[in-house]
A protein has these predicted regions:
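Active-site-proximal alpha/beta segments of enzymes that process anionic O-linked groups
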Residues: 198, 230-463, 558-559, 564-585
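A long, amphipathic alpha-helix that forms part
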Residues: 427-431, 464-502, 553, 557
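Histidine-centered active-site microenvironments of extracellular/periplasmic hydrolases
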Residues: 77-81, 315-316, 498-499, 504-543, ...
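Transmembrane and membrane-interface helices of multi-pass
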Residues: 1-252
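Flexible glycine/proline-enriched surface loops and loop-helix/loop-strand junctions
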Residues: 356, 414, 471, 544-550
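Metal-dependent active-site segment of extracytoplasmic phospho-/sulfohydrolases and closely related
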Residues: 296, 481-520, 563, 567
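Acidic helix/loop microenvironments that form the catalytic cleft of cell-wall polysaccharide enzymes
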Residues: 447-451, 506-514, 587-589
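Membrane-interface soluble catalytic domains
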Residues: 4-52, 57-74, 78, 94-101, ...
Length: 614
């Protein structure tokens, strides 16, 4: 008896190990740019999934159900584990630097377990075969298989997975548009075959679910199965509580929910934006440049001033052009030495930096005016060029702001060659700008965003080894590459667009020596650069603004006040600008003691050693 039990235990241990290694292998081989700590995190995440699946098999065998009758549930689970991850990898392996899908794998494992637990549970309750249960489970299995099937059909047609953009198009379509799309792209025969195929699959699964109730259940009283009944109930409730969150994180649902969030935010933003824009009163300066001119704002990504040689970083010359420009021409290149981000991630930081909303007024984003609005009202033609991902639903507020520009363009949209894009690919966009107009240009770079190894061309490697992953040297190389990009932007704009002012700041900082954290963000991740170039003509035309900015180079500042600073640099007076928040104004009210960061949870004054790299 003991020998038999040991054999059974070995069988389940092998099954557990097989499922666990399968999930880890799928994640590992279909991921790109995944740091080791994320892999370790998923080792922990998939452990309970494998335990649940093993318990499902154990209880199925314990009650002598035929093993072949569990195959429909296995097929459903495996479809979720494999489909999205493999298709996403095939679609983006040559163009993406970060593929990190893990929810589909966990969802597949949990769905398999839950289906098995539920079937055993219901047979423990009714103790007899049931056509209704066969039908219900066959229908549920078919519904669950629809998601991987739709992804397979979509991939076979478009050679990519369902993106947020595709989901937005779907949610915006009315029934007639959807009908026309299906008829045009699939045709009546295709629609008929798909419906017929799904119907046949459902009938097949219903038949496969049909089984006889084993004697262990049909002839046993409730008391004998009481313990198993309670264990199954706990397992079913536990998985059911977590499963909706897991489902929301799967590839197809992440795209759909992201699209819904975007459309909801867009609806709110559009509802108030026109009204707010109409009410915006702007009084531009009476002093005019001698000919049409350009102001440029470059938004950096994850650029920490502690790692910039322009701010004293000595390990390597990571920003040689900025450093030399400031050293040789400090009257035109102004370096602000005590600037912080309002938060350690892009969306929360920039939705404040680019609008009236800040840490101190906590204004609703959807009711806030933007830097684009200010520039438009002041008579500038507005441009937004971005190397950020347009598929990134986390950047929804930023995309909403960007799309209000006269010209908004994401270079990802024009990536016909399916290659990795670098910030240097933004440079041709400047040639689209008309030099005979007053222009306000925003360039949103990828900067030093994870994974930094892919933020610069291999031939640009200066401090590391070509193609070798190293957090610190890759981060330094990404900083050096963007320093070169800034130089090219500056040179082209000064020679061709009558550049009068150029502002560079970052959404937040980073620390390549430490993994990124979402909570209790350390100060090093909040310390950012702010560098402003002013032309000779600008300084002669606006001497007061120039002198105030020079005086404020050692003033403390947070980037959620960039909206007012841009308004000040554009020489705008408005009913939607507060001079007390404007670093270019003598009225600027904030000091080291009053400024906050981390969305108001931290005081800047508590950063006792700004130069320390923790």
């Amino acid at each position: 008896m003991k020998k038999y039990a040991l054999k059974i235990n070995k069988k389940y241990f092998i099954f557990f190990l097989s499922i666990y290694l399968l999930m880890l292998s799928v994640f590992f081989f279909t991921s790109i740019g995944t740091e080791s700590y994320r892999f370790l995190l998923n080792m922990r995440r998939y452990f309970p999934v494998a335990v649940a699946a093993t318990l499902a098999l154990f209880y199925w065998n314990y009650y002598d159900f035929p093993v072949k009758k569990i195959l429909p549930d296995c097929f459903v689970g495996l479809s979720w584990i494999f489909t999205h991850n493999i298709l996403d990898y095939l679609a983006y392996r040559n163009v993406s630097t970060n593929i990190n899908n893990f929810f589909d794998i966990a969802f597949g494992g949990y769905v398999f377990s839950l289906l098995v637990f539920l079937r055993i549970f219901w047979y423990l309750v009714i103790k007899r075969p049931s056509k209704l249960i066969d039908f219900i489970f066959g229908f549920i299995q078919t519904a669950l298989l629809l998601f991987p099937l739709i992804e397979l059909v979509y991939f076979s047609y478009y050679h990519t997975t369902i993106s947020t953009a595709a989901s937005i198009a779907f949610l915006q379509s009315n029934p007639n548009e959807m009908k026309e799309y299906l008829l045009q792209n699939i045709g009546v025969l295709g629609i008929f075959c798909f419906i017929a195929g799904i119907s046949m699959l459902c009938i097949f699964l219903i038949k496969k679910n049909k089984l006889e109730v084993p004697a262990k259940i049909s002839s046993a009283g409730f008391r004998k199965n009481k313990r198993t009944f309670l264990v199954l109930l706990v397992l079913i409730i536990s998985i059911s509580v977590y499963l909706p969150k897991c489902f929301a994180g799967t590839g197809i649902m992440h795209s759909m929910l992201g699209a819904k969030q975007y459309l909801d935010n867009a609806k709110k933003f559009e509802k108030y934006h026109k009204e707010n824009f109409d009410q915006l009163q702007v009084i531009p300066s009476t002093n005019k440049f001698s000919k049409p001119s350009t102001v440029i704002l470059v938004i950096g990504e994850s650029a920490g001033r502690n790692f910039m040689s322009a701010y004293g970083y000595s390990a390597n010359d990571t920003t040689p052009w900025l450093r030399k420009s400031i050293e040789k021409d400090s009257t035109h290149f102004l370096r602000f030495n005590h600037v912080y981000s309002s938060y350690g991630s892009t969306m929360q930081s920039l939705e404040r930096a680019l609008t009236e909303k800040n840490q101190y007024n906590n204004k609703d984003f959807s009711r806030s005016l933007t830097i684009i609005d200010l520039a438009k009202k002041a008579g500038y033609k507005t441009y937004w060029f971005s190397n950020q991902s347009v598929k990134n639903t986390a950047d929804t507020p930023i995309q909403l702001i960007a799309r209000t520009a006269d010209v908004a363009y994401w270079i990802e949209d024009g990536n016909e060659n399916n290659r990795i894009l670098y910030d240097g690919d933004l440079l041709p966009c400047l040639k689209k700008v008309n030099a005979n107009e007053n222009n306000f240009i925003v360039l949103h770079v990828m900067g030093s965003h994870e994974l930094t190894l892919h933020r610069f061309p291999p031939e640009f490697t200066r401090f590391g080894t070509v193609g070798v992953f190293d957090l610190v040297s890759n981060y330094e190389d990404s900083m050096a590459y963007d320093d070169w990009v800034l130089q090219q932007i500056f040179s082209y704009a000064r020679e061709n667009l009558n550049l009068q002012a150029m502002v560079f700041f970052s959404d937040h900082g980073a620390n390549p020596y430490r993994k990124r954290v979402a909570d209790n963000i350390p100060f090093i991740n909040l310390r950012i650069p702010l560098i402003i170039y002013l032309s000779d003509e600008y300084e002669q035309l606006y001497p007061q603004t120039t002198s105030v900015l020079i005086e404020h180079e050692n003033q403390y500042f947070t980037n959620d006040l960039m909206y007012e600073l841009i308004g000040g640099i554009l020489q705008i007076k408005s009913n939607h600008l507060d001079e007390k928040n404007d670093l270019s104004s003598k009225e600027f009210q904030f000091t080291r003691d009053t400024l906050k960061t981390d969305l108001g949870r931290k005081n800047i004054k508590d950063d006792y050693n700004e130069n320390k790299i923790e």
